Every structure is written in structure tokens, then in C-alpha cells.
């Protein structure tokens, strides 16, 4: 088998509405998932023994390459579901280019990329891939196809969006190099249902008129998130900006690539200590 390569695309929540708490203790969400063209890089090559994972890259420090890693859990789930199709082992390299605990997919995107890569190569039915993704985490199903979708429930109930107007939209992701605890952010949400996502008009209009209900508690715990959002909002040509997921990564969409590039250069001067990724929406 040749060495397989796949991108684990960075996830962005263009809007994230927390509608309440469900009987099972999870929060009911409405969100618009979008994805950058860039992310972590996965490589895998079959072997005759067992799975092994090597984690490299600028954000590899502190990550465990053990059986609890979502990438290895994804391979295990595939092998258990299709024992006659999946080899005994894979030698896997994860190039961790995105910040960890940052609100942009992280382990979920990595697991989804592994499912997508192995599933496509061994011709595993897409419905099975999505079912396995759902068993691995709330954001994993959306990350499998990594395209513009609406999510409900805990994010796993997906509705395709026909509006393709955001494809190739210039994007800037910024993280102040702090990590956010998702449970802590949800714990500090004020419990107020501020209403549903707009379902009329363009997807950009729905996103802009929406909000991220986790941004206020995240900014309260980590005020630097507010500094990032405010810096982004001040840049020329910004369509809109806010925090993604439970933070601390924030994003800005631009109307023109030139304005995004100018903002990226300016960020490296104003805040060289912050992490940034200049990309496009898929």
C-alpha cells in the first residue's frame, strides 16, 4: 500500500447558538460549520503488526500517542467494523500544525481525516464512516466531509448547505497561544437561550446576524480573546469576525485576499507572539 496523506481541515464555527441543556446533560446547539483549506497533516502506511503513531509539528508537545488518541481510536473503530478490509496495523505520522484546545477541531478533525483517508482507500461505505465518526465525538461527523453545514443537537445532526457563496472566502485565524477548557466554558455559560439561527437569506447573512454564545464566558475567563476579536474587527476589509467554538481561536472573513494578507502582515508586527493562519474557506 502506498503512503496515504490527508489534511485535517481546521474547523470554524461561523455561529454557535447554545439553546439549552438536554436531559442527558449535554447542551443543545445550533451552529454553522465551515472549514479552512489548511490544517494538520496525516500520513499513514500499512504494516503487518500494529498501529503506531508519531506526533510531530509545532503543536506536538504534550500530546500522547497512546490508544486514547482519537486518531488511533478512529483506526481501531474502522478495523472492528471492517476486520476483513483493514490491515493489522498502520504506521501513522501526525504533523500537528494547529493549536490544541483551540476551538478549531483539533483531535476531532484529526480523527475525521483518518476515517476519511482510510475509508476512501479501502472503499468503506460513507454511511459507515459517518456512524463511526458519531461514536468518536460530537464534532467528528461534520469534520468527515469538512464542508459548509448546519449542525444541531450536540453538533452531530447535520444539514447540508446549498449556498456556495463562501467558498474561497479569504480567512484569517488567530490564537493568542492560550488554550481553553471546553467544559469550563460551557459551565460558565449563563443559561440564557437567545434564539435560533436565522434560516432565511444567504449563509453569510445568517452567520453575521448570529453569535457565539460561548464567547462571553470565554472572554470573561480569558480577556485576551476579546483583544483578539477587537483587533480583527479593526482591520480593513473584514466581513465579520468572532471566536470559534469554545475558543480561544478567533477568525475573520475578508472580502478581498489583499486585505487579508495586509492584516496577516500587520498582525505579525503588532502581535508577533500570537499564532495566525492565513487561509481560504473550503
Curated annotation (Swiss-Prot):
Keyword Nucleotide-binding: yes
Protein name listed in UniProt: 4-diphosphocytidyl-2-C-methyl-D-erythritol kinase
The enzyme's E.C. designation: 2.7.1.148
A GO MF term: 4-(cytidine 5'-diphospho)-2-C-methyl-D-erythritol kinase activity
Source organism: Zymomonas mobilis subsp. mobilis (strain ATCC 31821 / ZM4 / CP4)
Pathway: Isoprenoid biosynthesis; isopentenyl diphosphate biosynthesis via DXP pathway; isopentenyl diphosphate from 1-deoxy-D-xylulose 5-phosphate: step 3/6
Keyword annotations from UniProtKB, A to Z: ATP-binding, Isoprene biosynthesis, Kinase, Nucleotide-binding, Transferase
Record keyword Manganese present: no
Class of this enzyme: transferase
Amino acid at each position: 500500500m502506498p503512503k496515504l496523506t490527508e489534511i485535517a481541515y481546521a474547523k470554524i464555527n461561523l455561529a454557535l447558538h447554545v439553546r439549552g441543556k438536554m436531559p442527558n446533560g449535554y447542551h443543545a446547539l445550533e451552529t454553522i460549520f465551515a472549514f479552512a483549506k489548511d490544517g494538520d497533516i496525516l500520513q499513514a502506511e500499512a504494516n503487518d503488526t500494529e498501529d503506531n503513531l508519531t506526533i510531530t509539528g509545532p503543536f506536538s508537545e504534550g500530546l500522547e500517542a497512546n490508544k486514547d488518541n482519537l486518531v488511533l481510536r478512529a483506526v481501531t473503530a474502522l478495523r472492528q467494523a471492517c476486520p476483513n478490509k483493514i490491515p493489522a496495523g498502520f504506521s501513522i505520522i501526525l504533523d500537528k500544525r494547529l493549536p490544541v484546545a483551540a476551538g478549531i477541531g483539533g483531535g476531532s478533525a484529526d480523527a475525521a481525516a483518518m476515517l476519511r483517508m482510510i475509508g476512501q482507500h479501502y472503499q468503506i461505505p460513507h454511511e459507515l464512516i459517518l456512524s463511526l465518526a458519531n461514536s468518536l465525538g460530537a464534532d467528528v461527523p461534520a469534520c468527515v466531509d469538512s464542508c459548509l453545514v448546519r449542525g444541531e443537537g450536540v453538533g452531530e445532526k447535520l444539514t447540508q448547505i446549498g449556498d456556495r457563496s463562501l467558498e474561497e472566502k479569504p480567512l484569517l485565524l488567530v490564537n493568542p497561544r492560550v488554550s481553553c477548557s471546553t467544559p469550563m466554558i460551557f459551565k460558565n455559560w449563563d443559561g440564557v437561550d437567545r434564539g435560533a439561527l436565522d434560516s432565511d437569506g444567504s449563509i453569510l447573512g445568517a452567520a453575521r446576524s448570529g453569535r457565539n454564545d460561548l464567547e462571553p464566558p470565554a472572554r470573561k475567563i480569558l480577556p485576551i480573546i476579546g483583544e483578539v476579536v477587537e483587533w480583527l474587527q479593526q482591520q480593513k476589509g473584514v466581513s465579520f469576525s468572532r471566536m470559534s467554538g469554545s475558543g480561544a481561536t478567533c477568525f475573520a472573513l475578508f472580502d478581498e485576499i489583499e486585505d487579508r494578507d495586509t492584516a496577516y502582515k500587520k498582525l505579525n508586527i503588532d502581535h508577533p507572539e500570537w499564532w495566525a493562519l492565513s487561509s481560504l474557506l473550503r
